[in-house]
Amino acid sequence: MALRKIRIEQVNSRDGFEQFARLPFQVYAERDAWWPPDVHNEIDLLSGRALITAHLDLCPFAAFSDGRLVARVSAVVNHRYNEHWKEKLGQLIHFEALADEEDAVAALMEEALTWLERRGMNAARSGFAAFLDYPYAIDNYAELPSFLLRGNPDFYHRYFKNARFATEKGQVDYTAPLTPEIQTRYRQMIEAAQATGAAIKSWREFGFLAAIDAWTDITNAAFDRHWGWNPITRAEVRPMLLPLQPTLVADLSMIGVVDGQPVGAVFSVPDLSGQLARLRGGIPLPPERGGGTRGALVNIGVIEAARSRGLARAMAAQSFLAMVRHQMRFAGYTLVIDDNWPSRRTAESLGARVTGNFVTYRRDLP
């Protein structure tokens, strides 16, 4: 069999960005259900127009085999992350590839890793970066994952292992059935937190813009030493979340208040599969996966001084009860690092069980 001609290019044109951003439509073309990328936002990031790029050095790479685009990845130096953690860690984001392209992917990885090494990075991570990258699924390959999470093909793991990456962290995704019995327990959790002097308000009740700013500040404080996190700013979060004000996000997301001050926050979304997922006609989603019946708690945090009063549980419970009022039958609790036992115990107390597993990869350089 004739060898294919492999070519690796740095992407630096509008047409190139467009082609880069649309590769997932080939990778997942045969899937019954998947989350397509926001092509416009991805092009803004690649071209340096997104606010977050003020903190990044970013270079997208594309792999071509016999002239056909078959794989992509972006090499990133996130200065804000490295300053926060005092590390020299590079990131590989946007990774997607077609099947049976081992040679092209190997060449792509080496080109991107060399780019990071030349910028002084001593390690590379793929599969976790705040607002930039999410971990790789290791099960449920044929199913629609929770909102924001990857539903990658299984062969991606061979690509990373062949590129000498190792698993750095595991993560889990939870799902809770919103049964009448568990709803009673949720109300008890809320009452217990209220008895300590805490109040829980939806973002709509708190004021949506004020809630966005509170969420930003609380998340920065609560996640300050959380693996993989880096600080974010109100200026970059506001334009991302303000468009959600007219949606159910305002009713499902919560702010925990103690002594008049916001000390806890939950960001939750309704079932977005009907609006954002790419679904093959005539194939229904399982109710615990979507189809209008699965909300998701995406982020939860409580500042250290307000912990140990059950506020995280109570905010999640309030969010899940709001989902019930809007006809949702299942709630996701997404995404928890394997060894984050406080958050895992919170999920379990809410009646949730692990329904998806994910990993983040790392490779030392050179």
Predicted regions and their residues:
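TRNA-binding/sensing appendages of the translation machinery
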Residues: 2-45, 113
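A structural motif corresponding to the C-terminal lobe/cap of the Radical SAM core domain
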Residues: 349-360, 364
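Short beta-strand-to-coil "C-cap" segments at the C-terminal boundary of structured domains/repeats
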Residues: 176-178, 362-366
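Acyltransferase donor/substrate-recognition loop-hinge adjacent to the catalytic core
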Residues: 3-6, 150-228
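A conserved beta-strand-loop-helix scaffold within acyl/acetyltransferase catalytic domains
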Residues: 24-65, 73-83, 210-301
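Short beta-strand segments
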Residues: 125, 175, 255-256, 267, ...
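Acyl-donor binding region in acyl/amide transferases
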Residues: 83-164, 283-349
